[in-house]
Amino acid sequence: MDIVTEHLKRGRYYAPGKHAGPTCFSKNISKNNAFRAKIKDLNRKIESVFFGCAHNQPLIALVYYKQREQIVRESKLQGKNTRIELSFLLRNLTSEDPNSTYTKEKIYELITDYHDGRQELLFFFWNHLVDTVNFTEILVDRKSGKEVSAISAN
């Protein structure tokens, strides 16, 4: 766990069988683009963890990909281009709707039911990302090309 934490502090992501170097932001890149790059990096971290355990926890992977499909489909119906980041996953992980298939409690059960070394890694992402980061999708108007909603983060 300490190794994983150290990798993440240095801007690296870690998953079983994978290891990437630090993500560097160019000094001349705009603040908005740098922030987007940071979010994409977090997205990769989450995706690598969830994809890495998909053979043992198919429901977690299903949540991720089904929600992605749903948001893309809804956005197209609304005539918008949507850049999908983490919001759909986090929204389901933190859902308080008792009728939702994927409530926070249900996903937490799936994570705590995990019994090898990756359980700690999943806990790390749960505690350090889901509880501290809040994302919204970036919606882009097709005609103007302008963003109609901004990224938000705590």
From Swiss-Prot:
Keywords: Mitochondrion
Originating species: Marchantia polymorpha
Protein name: Uncharacterized mitochondrial protein ymf13
Superkingdom in the source lineage: Eukaryota
GO cellular component: mitochondrion
Compartmental location: Mitochondrion
Chief localisation class: mitochondrion
